[in-house]
């Protein structure tokens, strides 16, 4: 089944019975080809961090339970799962009786692993779990006075650099693109760490703004930005982390790094999450 003839982007009927066939998988290679990326020789390491805030089920006595579910899809997976299909799938547990939270976790992770063709890991957190908030690390470039006229498609020729080597961390809250399926806006905060030729901050901001009317999945936007910066400055080190705001009770936060021994970014939520 393709995106065009799937139920995605159309009016949906929510099922109240557990149904793993609701998950809709999409090959990563379809979007990576355009970027010159092949799955067996990835130029990055990393993970897609998903936070699902609307998980609910029934316990053995029929009492509703609610929780937050965080899971991690490795970049080495051959497929991703479309976010609306994940929402529909998770909602199919709403009237489903589960013996324990651990059993529920095993079921969901197995279904996600089956669809992504990779080992998906994750945890279910009680709704009363204490959550820490933070702010983006690094230098914020949003207040630079620039004129913008390009809002899509993304224009990598806007990236400029200086012939001086630096190690720095930059962030912007102005990243926006649109969902490839629904056309709804995806708002994101991006954190860029690198060691190499100094990126011109004003030019980088113009480049990020050029995603504004772009229709791509969150994962593809992250890989496009990573690839474009890598091709522009050939850095010794580069990492990209995009924290998207939630839509439909789910947020997706892609992380890409040249370091195979990367550590996951801080789990602190930003104010827009």
UniProtKB/Swiss-Prot annotation:
Pfam families: QueF, QueF_N. The keyword Cytoplasm applies. GO terms for cellular component: cytoplasm. It is found in: Cytoplasm. Substrate binds at residues 81-83, 218-219. The active site is at 179 (thioimide intermediate), 186 (proton donor). SUPFAM superfamilies: Tetrahydrobiopterin biosynthesis enzymes-like. GO terms for biological process: queuosine biosynthetic process; tRNA modification. Its EC number is 1.7.1.13. The keyword DNA-binding does not apply. Coiled coil: none annotated. NADPH binds at residues 83-84, 247-248. Keywords: Cytoplasm, NADP, Oxidoreductase, Queuosine biosynthesis. InterPro entries: GTP-CH-I_C/QueF, NADPH_dep_7-cyano-7-deazaG_red, QueF, QueF_N, QueF_type2. It catalyses: 7-aminomethyl-7-carbaguanine + 2 NADP(+) = 7-cyano-7-deazaguanine + 2 NADPH + 3 H(+). It comes from the Bacteria. Pathway: tRNA modification; tRNA-queuosine biosynthesis. GO terms for molecular function: preQ1 synthase activity. Homodimer. Catalyzes the NADPH-dependent reduction of 7-cyano-7-deazaguanine (preQ0) to 7-aminomethyl-7-deazaguanine (preQ1). PANTHER family: NADPH-DEPENDENT 7-CYANO-7-DEAZAGUANINE REDUCTASE. NCBIfam families: QueF. Belongs to the GTP cyclohydrolase I family. QueF type 2 subfamily. This is NADPH-dependent 7-cyano-7-deazaguanine reductase. The lineage of its organism: Bacteria, Pseudomonadati, Pseudomonadota, Alphaproteobacteria, Rickettsiales. The gene is queF.
């Amino acid at each position: 089944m393709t995106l065009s003839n799937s139920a995605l982007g159309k009016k949906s009927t929510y099922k109240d019975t557990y149904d793993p066939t609701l998950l809709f998988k999409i090959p990563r290679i379809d979007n990576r080809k355009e970027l010159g990326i092949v799955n067996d020789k990835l130029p990055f390491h990393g993970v897609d961090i998903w936070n699902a805030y609307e998980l609910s089920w029934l316990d053995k006595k029929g009492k509703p339970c609610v929780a937050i579910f965080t899971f991690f899809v490795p970049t080495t997976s051959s497929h991703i799962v479309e976010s609306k299909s994940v929402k529909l799938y998770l909602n199919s547990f709403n009237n489903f009786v589960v013996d324990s939270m651990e059993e529920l976790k095993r079921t969901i992770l197995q279904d996600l692993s089956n669809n992504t063709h990779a080992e998906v890991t994750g945890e279910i957190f009680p709704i009363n779990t204490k959550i820490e908030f933070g702010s983006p690390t690094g230098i914020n470039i949003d207040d630079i006075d620039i004129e913008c006229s390009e809002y899509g498609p993304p224009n990598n020729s806007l990236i400029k650099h200086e012939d001086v080597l630096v190690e720095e961390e930059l962030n912007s809250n102005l990243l926006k693109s649109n969902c490839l399926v629904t056309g709804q806006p995806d708002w994101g905060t991006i954190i860029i760490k690198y060691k190499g030729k100094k990126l011109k901050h004003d030019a980088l901001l113009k480049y990020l703004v050029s995603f504004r009317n772009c229709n791509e999945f969150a994962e593809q936007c992250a890989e496009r930005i990573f690839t474009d910066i890598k091709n522009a400055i050939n850095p010794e080190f580069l990492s990209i982390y995009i924290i998207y705001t939630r839509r439909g009770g789910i947020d997706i936060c892609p992380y890409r790094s040249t370091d195979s021994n990367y550590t996951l970014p801080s789990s602190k939520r930003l104010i827009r999450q």
